[in-house]
Amino acid sequence: MLATVRLLLVGATLLISPLPVAAQFSGSAREDTLTSQFDVAGIPVILRRVTANNVVAANLYLLGGSRQLTPVTAGIEMLLLEASERGTARYPRDVLRSKMARLGSAIGVSPGADWTTIGVRATVAGFDSTWAILSDRLAAPTLAAAEVELVREQFVTAVRQRKDSPDALLEYLADSIAFAGHPYALDPVGTEESLTRLTVADLKAYQATQIVSSRMMLVVVGNVSRARVERLVRESIGRLPKGTYAWKAPAPPASLPSAYLIERRVLPTNYLQGYFHGPTATSKDYAALRLACAVLSGRLFAEVRSRNNLSYSVNAPFVERAFSVGGLYVTTTSPDRVLDIMQEQIKSLRDGYITPDGLERLVQQFIVTYFLDNETNADQANMLARAALYQGDYRRASRFVSELRSITPEDIRNAARTYMTNVRWAYVGDPAKVTPSKLTKF
């Protein structure tokens, strides 16, 4: 949180120059000598050897995400994987939980738009035993009807409660309108309807056909050797059916005009989230739009919150995916006034020029934030996975700094002109407080 605030403040101090600036910022990436990539039984594995701590983070990525789902099956993968914690062929429920507690390990499931992450956190000494439990959860979950029903009830309750949380509801609505007609419009967590209809037979069929090694990529960060990782993978998930899945980046969503969804709620404030589509992760514009969103965040913070006191929370998020997504977010009692300010600040970013000194300060802050955000082994695993899957090479992760430094003020201006348009909005609050024509002007 502190890093985010610092970054907003740096973005807010960037100045506008009346003339173009073509200064090129350069930086050299350090070669990553700690990381290697290899295949085990057809499963790509990335291993980063870290000896500074006793923690092993192993993230197994089940590739496909929302593209694996339909409106009828949304939530099936998460339900299956969470229900597997209730017992497997080798580890009945109570044995599994007792063993995990003794090991001090954790296995977490995080469904996403492009993949589901199954994260193992263990000590070096406990890694093999924890991995054995994970492997059995994938290969041989018991899926007892009573246990599945308990897990289902938990998730249905959580989905229902989404309607009671303005931010959660806003995010759900914003995704649905921003990605209309695209798989990203499906929530991998599922809906009340889809979760209610899924049966134990559905879960067993999904496990048999979709928990296959061709959908898997493993990233391990910790003090474990390649030989150890190869043995563990070969003797466990390497024996799963291969399947026919082949990873490729999703197709970008169709270009759609500005639009909006309004959900009436009686609340102390109003919530707005708009998204616009950005470039692919392999484009130089990717880093340029990332910085443009940071600049816009800083200026919105200064104008909306600091100078006009119209909101306690406002920003321009940048979402990392195979193709990027930028956005505009605010909670406010005066949405029309804030929308006017957002329009003004986007126009300023398109028409003006950031000074080289201002850009250098922003990039330096990004570098600091980057290293803070990748301190833990788990964070590093996710960083390597995004680089490998979105950009085609895990080594792109170590080039993040040099890619940021290569962006010029003109690149940021062009990114704002090219991508900060056709914003698709979700609004939760009092419809009388917002003018629809202001939403469609973006």
Describe the residue ranges of each PLM region.
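M16/MPP (pitrilysin/insulinase) zinc-metallopeptidase core fold and M16-derived inactive scaffolds
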Residues: N59-V124, D164, D187-P188, V295-N309
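Scaffold signal of the M16-like zinc-metallopeptidase fold and its non-catalytic homologs
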Residues: R162-V212, V233, S283, S313, ...
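A structural supersecondary motif
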Residues: S66, Q273-Y275, C293-T332
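Bacterial N-terminal signal peptides
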Residues: R6-P20
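An aromatic/glycine/proline-enriched structural segment found at the starts
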Residues: F25-S26, A180, P188, V212-S213, ...
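C-terminal regions of mature proteins
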Residues: Q24-S28, M217-G222, H277, L328-Y329, ...
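Short acidic/His-enriched helical or mixed secondary-structure segments at domain edges of catalytic enzymes
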Residues: Q154-L173, A251-T269, S306-L310, R321, ...
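M16/insulysin-pitrilysin zinc metalloprotease superfamily fold
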Residues: R86-R90, R121-R152, F318-D373, T440-F442
